[in-house]
Structure formats: structure tokens, C-alpha cells
Amino acid sequence: MTKNNEGFTHRNFAAVLQKYKYDLNLGDIVAGTIFSFELNGVLVDIGTPISAYLPIQEVSSNQDLNNFTSLNINDTREFFLLDYNIQSKQLILSIRRLEYIRAWKRIRQLLAEDSLLNVMIKGFNKGGMIINLEGISGFVPNSHLGNFQKSEQFNNKFIKLKLLNVEEKSNNLILSHRRALISQASSNLIVGNIIEGIINQITPYGLFIKVGNLKGLVHISEINIKNLEQISSQFKIGDTIKAVIIHVDKKQGRLSLSMKHLR
């Protein structure tokens, strides 16, 4: 059974519901009981004269569960009222859309609470890490992976993350491992404290220092050198240095260090 509702508007939908005296609206969440399986969908009793229909592609937002294995006869649960099939005169239901709505609601709550999250890694691409949070695909840019080394061996493993940018309308979910690390170590990251770390990157604008699981930056302006050429001659990757914490940016997960302020 398929839908062919081109040009079918919300106003048409409301007229149909009124004609058949359904006390329902497009977008409603309704309770129903599964009573029959068909080839490409499920029949559901939601209290209307004609049974509602749940297409197989609307079973779950999780592609691994987008089949009938998660459903049983006589299961009673909630469904999202998605559409109306003119030919069959059936209301079309969705579990996938309901999961999507509830997932974003939960993500907004996690953002408001600035929660530390334990999230499954789904894979990697050139730009960073792909994750899954509450059934929604998200992304961790390379710049927010900290010292984490990308490798397929970590697929389906869990990593600590914090939300960085959430845009539901564009389905944009950006997270940060760097923020999570800063949050976990925040009690030890006190401005003015001296830390010891290993240089793991030398750039024209400063030194990146590995401090445990964290990565800190000693900007060129915070190094005791007279000219830029000295930075590559004076420092080598793997050198252990001491620096002072001058700023902890918990929002972006940045650790700023200085060698000028060493006593």
C-alpha cells in the first residue's frame, strides 16, 4: 500500500476528518493497537471506523529497526498522525516522526542542562567524527576532537561529548569532545596554576601542548622569544615544557597557556 497524495493540503485533510467525524488533526499523537501485518505495513486500531496504516518506512528512525521485528500483534502504543491516503481512506501513522520529535525535545533539554554525554561513535570522515545521539545523527569536527585519534577500531564505542551547536530546523547537531574533557578536568584547571605538558604541534602562531587528555595552546605572544623564527629552533615536538594557565574557555573547550608568566 502506497500513498499518492500530491496536492493534498492540510485544509483537505481537515475536510476529510470533518466528513468522517474524526476528532483528530494532522500532527496529533494518538494511541493505537496493532492488529494485523500486511506486506508493506501494519494495520492499527486507533478508534476510527477505518483502521489506520503504519508503513514499514515509518516504523523507526533507526534504519536497523525499520522493519516489523520491533512490533507485535496487540501492541498498544503512541503514533504520530502523519497523513491521509485518499485511495484507501486511511489515516497514515508514523513511529519514526514521533521518535524524531521526542529526540529533539530530549536534545534541547540536554543542551539546557549542559550535560556530559556518553555517545556512540558511528564512524569518521575527513572532517571529523559521526555520532548518534537519541537516534539523531551528529558530528564532531576535527577541531573539537582534542587529542583523540580517529580510527575505525573505535566504531560503535562510546566517547564523552558535550553539545556545541543545536539547530533543529536544519537538523544540525554539532558536539565537542574538547568541551567534555575540559568539563571533566575543570576542578584542576585553575587560572594561575602551572602545568607541565608535551609539545605535540608547532605552528606559526604558537605551540600546542598535550596536558594529559587535554590540548592547550601557548600563543606566540605568550612565548619568551624575540622573533617568529626562534619558535622552530627553540622548541621541538616531544619537548616537555611548563606553562601557566591564563584562560579556560568551557564553552568552546579551549585551554590557553603562557610561558611569559612563569615565575
UniProtKB/Swiss-Prot annotation:
Cell compartment(s), UniProt: Plastid, Chloroplast
Record-linked Gene3D superfamilies: Nucleic acid-binding proteins
Any single GO BP term: translation
Domain called S1 motif: residue spans: 27-96, 114-178, 192-260
Main location: plastid
Pfam families: S1 (PF00575)
InterPro entries for the chain: NA-bd_OB-fold, Ribos_protein_bS1-like, Ribosomal_protein_S1-like, S1_domain
Protein family according to the UniProt entry: Belongs to the bacterial ribosomal protein bS1 family.
The protein's name in its UniProt record: Small ribosomal subunit protein bS1c
Gene field: rps1
